[in-house]
């Protein structure tokens, strides 16, 4: 849409431009201009604004150009140049430049200058005149103006709101006028500070085309709300082509004309910066921008070569400004994204937030309420935070307007985000620095963080917060854009802050317990991804990113309103979460301090926790932060006080929770759904990051992410520790005095009564976290803890407690810890007593661990963790650990939701994480990975169970079982297991984390961490031997992890299902699955990498015989596993293991062995037994050991195997070359793969692959076993395959066939063995294909029987047939057939090929002649045997369809067997080979004569597919042929081929319908001509049964055509042969179609045929040969054909004469094919159409074709065959007789299908012959 030149006129005038330039100069668009260098930017920015005036005022404006390098004089020169430059010069310049190449859509720069609003409707109240802004939406781009208020509110009529803002859009100009992208939407929106939401007052829509046509204009539009007038809006529109409005567009013509009217001023470049060629300004070097990370090494704008005369680097003020904190966070988020798609989405979400009016409005309201509440705390926080908050406020104030504009454009809510982030970081820093900040400070920080969190949750709230700091107006200005970006950026900030940032968010959520948790949930886990994923359309473009959070915020605000001032005050009181997150330790302490608040948050979060447990934790952290502030010095006693305090807080929280309860669960569910989707991505990313990071903290984070339920209790490093833990457990029980228990019960009961179940679960989580934090006096641990740990507040706490314990644990006496834990437990009990206890206990354990990790607390913690982790177990734990079991049960009922599992798991996991951080012994990747795995999963998998102490394994298995089992079962099992664990405390501690599988994952990770005290992994807890055991367990765990995860997911989902909708459950499941998959994959990769080698290396030095030792160890482990599994493995695990196939078990074992090796190596290295320098050697040794182990036993085996594998691989590769049909190739490949896999798997299983993997020494045995069981296994495989029962074992072990051992085995196989294998495979394939066909309904029982007979015949006569085939080097056809046969039967094919190759052509010809004679007799015999059938077919011709199947079945009996083999692949190949041989014999026999060769080729085509039918028809023909001596052989050949064709036809119908389809075509040609009834029946049969196959064949033929366009002859032969060989192939149909297409073009076809005959006489000869049979002239003609056109014409003449007789027969059969071919005269058309017809129900098509062919028989055929052709058929009656025999042959199914035969009774026959040559040509 190129606007008229007028459009550009306004811009051409400086006056017009001047005004616009001013506006444009400040716009970011200018800065973005790719063409603009820093200089240009300055010129356009500072200069541009002044230039317009400079033009009018002279040089007065020049001084304003401060950024300009030159002086005012320089600018004047530039302006003069620009103004004085003549058009001619411009023209010359433009002529010099090459024309732009059109590319992409037309683009342009649209400038919209929003001037003012006036003439407001009187009805509008004055209140609506405040905080108004215009939102401009074009396509997906959304930009907002600053917020403005009415200048005059006294006189409504004269009220004017001046915006005076210009927004630029780079727009694509759609080609269609009605394209919705052409709509420019201007919306007048008012932001309500009180409600914190935006309201749409009115809107107006303008069409882009109008703007383009007018170019530049000012228009006053009416803003309407529906049909109600609101006001008048004065807008100036400017449009200029080119992305940046410079008139450059690849679709606009003269450059000079385009540049003239640029939207921006055109200034002549300074002489020193003018390019001499293009006369454009050269780029200017700019200093490296401060906002770009130095590591990026950005070179854009820097000259490649510094020239001496180049000016110094330009310093731009803007570029020197340090980036805001948000930018760094965003960078981190961006860099953390793994895929370009994610990165693009992330950037798009920032730059182009989606519109979501309602959400943004709601969010705004919520934010406003929160902001008002938290204004003072925010201010305090800002003060505490220091620079950050003030910075944000100042920026908001100073840049409120600009930033809003820029932010809205650029998504710059950085100030707000910075504020929250900075606040968080500052607060954290201050808290950490102060360790015990004054309560006031802490409180203020906490409050601010909460407010910020809330704001972040609703991105607008952040803006609000800023706005609160600054005037409301500014806040309004910033609010929308900030809100949008805050949402997106805030999560990123949180991520950047890691745990702190997450914590910060949770406080915000905590501020509005129910609401905050919801959006917090989104933020903590998806801080960054959240806005990427949640590209919700905020009310404003900036608000767009707020969508999810805004919704939550809105909901939260609503809920807050419901909650009332008390709840709001409580939230406000919470320390700002961001600050707390930074002061992780204090936040935790605060949590411990305010359990009530936590409970409230938890309640809210619980509802939201189901979606995002992390949010709950975060809230807890906020509370902890506030508590820490209150209790700067968190001592155990203080913690106790805090816990009691928390109880008080809980009371408040209960109120909040009540109010939260008011919030509809539907809202929670919705939020949870959003959270789930976000969390799934975030967790995946986090898990990836965690897995990638070897740090323990990362592991804990990863565990948290992978599954917050990963409550892995760290096993104490010593059994004594376990004893201590057990003692502690008892002590904890003792600690929980009856009074405490009663108190906790009462508190819990009250809380439960007051607080919703969800809030309860949340509270428990928070409480758990609080005790941990309180235990961690420093709260610094939180700082150290990664975001991931923060993602789950509990996780952060985990990390913190570990540090705190490490820091204060040694000093703290176990009693104090016990006391504290007791109090915490009570406090937690109030929220969720058991959880609190578990967290406290855990922390105590951690603290004690430094002291000696008294087992009692650890045990108690583990026990509690187990209970908590198992949602149902939670209540049990409470019952067991706490008297208030009823309350826990209530909580459990509430917790069963994802919140429950995730909360408990998170709490425990976090605490354990703290322990893990405290004891980050497992530095190795393997140990970390193992730690990351859920203990339950490990135990269930048997990795930990076997490896760890028997008790521990038993416990863990029990725990795992409990987790796996339903909730009730879990409770019972967990109780039982917890008891067992308490008994086997150390082990139980490790295995205690049995909670839901998510929880289990966490527990496992934690367990590893605790183990780290002893060993990085669970096995580390044990001695090195134990470690070795552990490694196998790890392998098992890895293998079983998924199963465990699935069971865990199921249990989790079961618990969640209560509260979550199906969609939520599904989302959670997928999320957990993704997390676990990523986690386990990572673990697998890490563990598999070097651990095995390391272990083996370790074993080698440590043991005399490393391999033997490993084997022994593995055997011992296996025994131990067997012994331990029964008692240790949970029932589900046992069932799972029992269900595992041997191969799967072996896989598991091998993985375990590798894991054990890796683990042992790591453990040894960690324990100092092995030095880092030794590790590489050890790994190498292990690797060598594995290799040796594989080679020792299986040396010969491997050699044979490798040979076999190589053979197979070469065979498969050959498949690719020869299989033109991709479908067939894929099927064959998969089939072979299955067979090989089954075979090898069986052999491998017999040879104990498991041991092989575990101790590579097994390989020798395996090799022998494999060798022994090769034949047997193959037979079994064949049976299985034929039965179609490959079993999942087969699928699971798909890798085995490709394993080195398999390859070695194959390589080692002798040729004989390989041949046997191949033969078995071929037979297998044949039977399998047949069975599959029959099962799939492609083959009828009769056909199947016939095929079976054929297969039997092939098997019996496969050798001679193969021998004949070997002889048949039918150029392309034979070669292809041979190749194909090779694919199907490598051995037979290879032998045949070699034979064929070895035999010289003369010998081949002689052999062919002999074979021809034999075949003549043989086919004749077959025909005799089937003669009745053939005759019957003729007689049944009317019943074509019915009889054809029978005939096909009967005829195939002998020949079909051959084709049956091809169907079974090997037999098919044999059949093809035989057919080829026969064809070759015929062809070779006739090759000397052109006619003979042509005839033979023709025969071959039908012979390959239609040849069988030809043979069948050739009984009578044989007689006729015998009558004609010259044609005798040919006739025999034809007959034989016909028979062959019929066989393939039967075969095709039975199995490869596609080949049948092709077969029917040739056969139809032959049959319809000579034996129309039989042929037609065959065709009908084919069409009915092989309609689908015919389609495939057509496709295949097309493929062949495309592949072999250069060898049409070869293609015909090849296609025919392939059709015969590959009943599955589509070529036959295609060939037929090709032939049919050729028929219409008889002359061209004749030429082609002649050429084909020359090139491939055998291929083309079949039809020519038929002609020869018709007359000796045909032979001469064919000889001539070898001469080209003359002979062909003669042949054509002869063909018509012979065709008439067959025509009559063909009429019946031809009609179907005729329709197909009649419509398609061109070869391509015919083939395509024919294929299409075949694609359709072939039977119906046949009928239609019949009718058409009968109608066309006289006319259509003539049309196809041309007049002369139609005449010739009538002219040669004698030939017609011959034609009948030959035409019958000639009218192969292909011809019939192509409809060539039945064009006309006489003419159609003649035409059929003509078309047939064409067909051959086409079939090439």
From Swiss-Prot:
Residues 360-383, 403-443, 695-722, 838-857 are annotated as: Disordered. One of its GO terms (biological process) is sperm capacitation. Changing residue 113 to R: In SPGF68; uncertain significance. The keyword Cell membrane applies. It holds the Pfam family CTSRT. Residues 87-222 form the C2 domain. Component of the CatSper complex or CatSpermasome composed of the core pore-forming members CATSPER1, CATSPER2, CATSPER3 and CATSPER4 as well as auxiliary members CATSPERB, CATSPERG, CATSPERD, CATSPERE, CATSPERZ, C2CD6/CATSPERT, TMEM249, TMEM262 and EFCAB9. HSPA1 may be an additional auxiliary complex member. The core complex members CATSPER1, CATSPER2, CATSPER3 and CATSPER4 form a heterotetrameric channel. This is Cation channel sperm-associated targeting subunit tau. The gene is C2CD6.
């Amino acid at each position: 849409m190129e606007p008229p030149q007028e459009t550009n006129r306004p811009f051409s005038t400086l006056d017009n431009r001047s005004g616009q330039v001013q506006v444009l100069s400040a716009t970011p668009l200018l800065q973005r201009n790719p063409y603009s260098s820093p200089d240009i930017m300055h010129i356009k920015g500072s200069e541009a604004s002044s230039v317009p005036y400079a033009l009018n005022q002279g040089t007065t404006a020049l001084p304003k150009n401060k950024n300009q390098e030159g002086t005012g004089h320089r600018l004047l020169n530039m302006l003069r140049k620009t103004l004085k430059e003549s058009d001619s010069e411009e023209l010359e310049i433009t002529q010099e430049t090459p024309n732009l190449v059109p590319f992409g859509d037309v683009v342009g720069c649209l400038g919209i200058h929003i001037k003012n609003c006036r003439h407001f409707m009187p009805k509008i109240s004055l209140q609506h005149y405040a905080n108004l802004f215009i939102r401009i939406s074009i396509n997906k781009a959304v930009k907002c103006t600053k917020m403005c208020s009415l200048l005059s509110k006294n006189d409504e009529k004269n009220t004017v709101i001046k915006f005076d803002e210009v927004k630029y859009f780079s727009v694509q100009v759609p080609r269609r006028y009605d394209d919705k992208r052409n709509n420019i939407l201007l919306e007048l929106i008012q932001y309500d500070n009180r409600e914190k939401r935006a309201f749409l007052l009115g809107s107006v829509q303008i069409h882009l085309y109008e703007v383009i046509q007018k170019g530049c204009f000012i228009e006053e539009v009416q803003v309407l709300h529906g049909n109600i007038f609101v006001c008048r809006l004065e807008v100036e529109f400017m449009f200029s082509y080119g992305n940046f409005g410079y008139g450059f567009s690849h679709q606009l013509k003269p450059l000079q004309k385009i540049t003239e009217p640029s939207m921006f001023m055109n200034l002549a470049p300074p002489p020193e910066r003018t390019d001499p060629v293009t006369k454009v300004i050269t780029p200017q070097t700019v200093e490296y921008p401060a906002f770009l990370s130095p590591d990026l090494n950005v070179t854009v704008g820097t000259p490649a070569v510094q020239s001496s005369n180049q000016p110094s680097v330009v310093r731009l003020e803007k570029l020197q400004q340090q980036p805001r904190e948000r930018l760094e966070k965003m960078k981190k988020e961006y860099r953390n994204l793994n895929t370009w798609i994610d990165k693009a989405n992330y950037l798009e979400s920032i730059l182009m937030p989606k519109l979501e009016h309602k959400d943004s409005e709601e969010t705004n309201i919520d934010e406003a309420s929160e902001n008002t509440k938290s204004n003072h705390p925010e201010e305090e926080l800002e003060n505490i935070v220091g620079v950050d908050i003030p910075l944000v406020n100042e920026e908001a104030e100073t840049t409120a307007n600009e930033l809003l504009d820029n932010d809205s454009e650029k998504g710059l809510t950085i100030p707000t985000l910075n504020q929250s982030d900075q606040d968080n970081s500052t607060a954290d820093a201050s808290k950490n620095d102060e360790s015990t900040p004054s309560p006031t400070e802490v409180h203020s920080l906490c409050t601010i963080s909460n407010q910020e969190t809330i704001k972040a949750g609703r991105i607008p709230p952040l803006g609000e917060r800023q706005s609160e700091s600054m005037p409301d107006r500014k806040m309004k200005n910033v609010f929308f854009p900030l809100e949008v970006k805050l949402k997106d950026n805030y999560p990123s900030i949180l991520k950047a802050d890691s745990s702190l940032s997450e914590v910060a968010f949770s406080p915000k959520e905590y501020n509005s317990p129910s609401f905050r948790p919801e959006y917090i949930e989104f933020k903590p886990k998806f801080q960054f991804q959240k806005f990427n994923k949640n590209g919700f359309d905020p009310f404003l473009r900036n608000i767009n990113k707020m969508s999810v959070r805004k919704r939550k915020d809105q909901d939260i605000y609503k809920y807050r309103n419901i909650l009332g001032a008390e709840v709001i005050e409580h939230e406000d009181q919470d320390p700002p979460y961001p600050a707390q997150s930074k002061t992780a330790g204090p936040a935790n302490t605060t949590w411990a301090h305010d359990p009530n608040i936590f409970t409230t948050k938890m309640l809210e979060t619980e509802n939201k926790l189901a979606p995002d447990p992390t949010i709950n934790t975060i809230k807890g952290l906020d509370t902890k932060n506030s508590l820490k502030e209150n209790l700067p010095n968190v001592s155990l006693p203080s913690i106790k006080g805090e816990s009691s305090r928390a109880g008080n807080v809980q009371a408040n929280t209960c109120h909040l929770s009540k109010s939260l309860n008011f919030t509809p669960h539907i809202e929670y569910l919705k939020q949870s759904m959003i959270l789930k989707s976000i969390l799934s991505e975030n967790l995946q990313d986090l898990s990836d990051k965690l897995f990638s990071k070897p740090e323990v903290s990362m592991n804990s984070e990863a565990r948290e992410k992978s599954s917050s339920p990963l409550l892995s209790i760290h096993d104490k490093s010593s059994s004594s520790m376990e004893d201590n833990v057990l003692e502690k457990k008892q002590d904890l029980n003792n600690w929980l005095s009856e009074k405490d228990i009663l108190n906790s019960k009462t508190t819990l009961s009250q809380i439960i009564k007051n607080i919703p179940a969800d809030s309860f679960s949340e509270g428990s989580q928070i409480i758990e976290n609080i005790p941990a934090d309180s235990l961690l006096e420093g709260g610094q641990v939180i700082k150290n803890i990664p975001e991931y740990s923060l993602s789950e507040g509990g996780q952060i706490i985990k990390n913190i407690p570990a540090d705190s314990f490490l820091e204060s644990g040694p000093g703290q006496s176990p009693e104090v810890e016990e006391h504290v834990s007791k109090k915490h437990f009570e406090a937690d009990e109030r929220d969720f007593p058991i959880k609190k206890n578990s967290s406290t206990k855990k922390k105590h354990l951690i603290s004690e661990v430094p002291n000696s990790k008294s087992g009692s607390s650890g045990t108690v913690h583990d026990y509690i963790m187990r209970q908590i982790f198992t949602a149902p177990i939670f209540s049990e734990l409470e019952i067991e650990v706490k008297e208030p079991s009823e309350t826990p049960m209530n909580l459990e009922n509430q917790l069963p939701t994802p919140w429950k599992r995730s909360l408990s798991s998170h709490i425990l996991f976090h605490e354990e994480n703290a322990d893990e951080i405290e004891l980050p012994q497992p530095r190795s990747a393997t140990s970390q990975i193992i730690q990351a795995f859920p203990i339950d999963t490990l135990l269930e998998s048997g990795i930990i169970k076997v490896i760890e102490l028997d008790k521990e394994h038993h416990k863990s298995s029990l725990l795992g079982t409990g987790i796996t089992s339903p909730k009730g079962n879990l409770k019972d099992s967990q109780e039982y297991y917890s008891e067992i664990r308490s008994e086997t405390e150390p082990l139980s501690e490790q295995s205690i984390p049995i909670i839901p599988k998510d929880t289990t994952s966490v527990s496992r990770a934690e367990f590893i961490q605790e183990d780290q005290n002893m060993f990085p992994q669970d096995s580390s807890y044990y001695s090195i031997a134990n470690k070795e055991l552990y490694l196998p367990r790890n392998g098992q765990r890895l293998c079983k992890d998924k199963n465990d995860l699935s069971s865990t997911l199921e249990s989790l989902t079961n618990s969640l299902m209560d509260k979550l909708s199906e969609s939520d459950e599904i989302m959670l499941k997928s999320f957990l699955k993704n997390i676990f998959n990523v986690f386990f994959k990572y673990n697998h990769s890490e563990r598999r990498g070097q651990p095995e080698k390391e272990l083996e290396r370790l074993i080698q030095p440590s043991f005399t015989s490393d391999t033997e030792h490993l084997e022994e160890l593995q055997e011992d482990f296996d025994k131990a596993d067997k012994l331990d599994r029964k008692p240790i493995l949970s029932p589900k695990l046992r069932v799972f293991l029992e269900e595992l196939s041997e191969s799967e078990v072996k896989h598991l074992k091998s993985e375990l062995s590798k894991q054990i090796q890796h683990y042992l190596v790591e453990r040894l290295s960690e324990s100092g037994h092995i030095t880092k320098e030794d590790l590489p050697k050890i790994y190498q040794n292990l690797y060598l050991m594995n290799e040796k182990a594989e080679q020792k036993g299986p040396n010969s085996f491997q050699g044979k195997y490798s040979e076999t594998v190589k053979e197979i691989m070469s065979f498969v590769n050959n498949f690719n070359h020869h299989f033109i049909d991709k479908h067939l190739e894929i099927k064959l490949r998969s089939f072979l793969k299955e067979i090989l896999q089954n075979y090898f798997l069986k052999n491998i299983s017999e040879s104990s692959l498991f041991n092989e993997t575990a101790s590579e020494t097994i390989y020798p045995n395996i090799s022998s076993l494999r060798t022994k069981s090769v034949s047997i296994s193959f037979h079994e495989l064949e049976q299985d395959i034929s039965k179609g029962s490959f079993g999942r074992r087969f699928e699971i072990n798909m890798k085995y066939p490709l394993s080195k051992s398999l390859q070695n085995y194959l390589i080692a196989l002798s040729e004989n063995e390989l041949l046997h294998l191949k033969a078995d495979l071929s037979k297998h394939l044949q039977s399998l294909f047949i069975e599959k066909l029959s099962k799939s309904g492609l083959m009828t029982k009769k056909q199947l029987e016939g095929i079976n007979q054929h297969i039997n015949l092939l098997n019996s006569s496969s050798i001679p047939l193969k021998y004949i085939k070997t002889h048949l080097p039918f150029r392309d056809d034979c070669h292809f057939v041979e190749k194909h046969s090779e694919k199907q039967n490598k051995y037979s094919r290879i032998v045949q090929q070699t034979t064929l190759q070895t035999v010289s052509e003369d010998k081949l010809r002689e052999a062919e002649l002999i074979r021809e004679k034999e075949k003549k007799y043989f086919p004749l015999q077959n025909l005799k045997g089937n003669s009745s059938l053939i005759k019957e077919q003729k007689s049944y011709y009317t019943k074509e369809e019915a009889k054809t199947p029978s005939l096909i079945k009967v005829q195939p009996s002998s020949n079909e067997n051959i084709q049956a083999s091809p169907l079974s692949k090997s037999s098919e190949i044999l059949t093809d080979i035989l057919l080829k041989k026969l064809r070759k014999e015929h062809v070779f026999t006739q090759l000397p004569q052109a006619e003979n060769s042509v005839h033979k080729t023709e025969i071959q085509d039908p012979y390959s597919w239609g040849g069988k039918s030809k043979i069948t028809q050739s009984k009578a023909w044989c007689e006729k042929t015998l009558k004609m001596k010259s044609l005798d052989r040919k006739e025999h050949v034809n007959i034989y081929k016909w028979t062959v064709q019929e066989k393939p036809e039967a075969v095709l119908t039975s199995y490869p319908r596609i080949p049948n389809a092709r077969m029917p075509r040739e056969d139809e040609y032959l049959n319809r001509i000579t034996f129309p009834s039989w042929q037609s029946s065959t065709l009908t049969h084919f069409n009915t049964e092989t309609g689908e196959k015919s389609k495939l064949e057509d496709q295949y033929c097309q493929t062949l055509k495309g592949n072999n366009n250069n060898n049409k002859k070869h293609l015909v032969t090849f296609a025919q042969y392939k059709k015969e060989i590959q009943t599955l192939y589509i070529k036959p149909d295609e060939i037929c179609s090709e032939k049919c297409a050729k028929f219409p073009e008889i002359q061209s076809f004749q030429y082609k045929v002649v050429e084909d005959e020359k090139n491939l006489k055998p291929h083309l000869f079949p039809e020519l040969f038929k002609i020869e049979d018709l007359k000796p002239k045909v032979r001469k003609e064919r000889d001539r054909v070898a001469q080209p056109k003359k002979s062909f014409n003669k042949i054509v003449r002869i063909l018509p004469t012979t065709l008439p007789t067959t025509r009559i027969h063909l009429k019946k059969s031809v009609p179907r094919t005729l329709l197909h071919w009649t419509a398609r005269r061109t070869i391509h058309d015919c083939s395509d159409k024919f294929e299409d017809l075949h694609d359709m129900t072939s039977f119906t098509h046949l009928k239609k074709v019949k009718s058409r062919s009968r109608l066309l028989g006289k006319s259509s055929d003539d049309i196809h065959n041309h007049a002369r052709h139609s005449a010739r058929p009538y002219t040669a009656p004698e030939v017609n007789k011959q034609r009948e025999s030959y035409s019958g042959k000639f009218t192969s199914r292909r011809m019939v299908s192509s409809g060539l035969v039945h064009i006309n009774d006489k003419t159609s026959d003649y035409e059929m012959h003509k078309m047939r040559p064409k067909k051959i040509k086409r079939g090439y």
